[in-house]
A protein has these predicted regions:
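Acidic, low-complexity/disordered tracts enriched in E/D and polar residues
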Residues: 1-42, 85-86
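Long, charge-rich, low-complexity alpha-helical segments
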Residues: 29-86
Length: 86
């Protein structure tokens, strides 16, 4: 599944971390790994490609990475920072 950043959502990277600002939401602060996932979503990567990219970057089990990516995507969708796209 591919995702895109929702209209009206702004973000800025500062010191390796991303701050997300969206209408009707408090700012969200992403840590380093969350920031990497956010930037890959912004580049148009699908969930599988995000997991593969992170697996190459970190020496962590794919199952753990997939769960972390999935959890973050669910949270971003719930807060309407991203949406499903084609």
């Amino acid at each position: 599944m591919k995702y895109s950043i929702c209209k009206g959502v702004l973000w800025q990277e500062t010191d390796g971390e991303i701050v997300i600002v969206a209408p009707k939401q408090d700012p969200a602060y992403l840590n380093e790994s969350g920031s990497i996932i956010w930037k890959l979503i912004d580049k148009g990567y699908d969930e599988t490609k995000i997991v593969a990219t992170l697996s190459k970057e970190y020496s962590e089990d794919d199952v753990i990475i997939r769960k972390d990516v999935n959890d973050m995507i669910k949270d971003l969708l719930k807060n309407e920072y991203i949406k499903e796209s084609n």
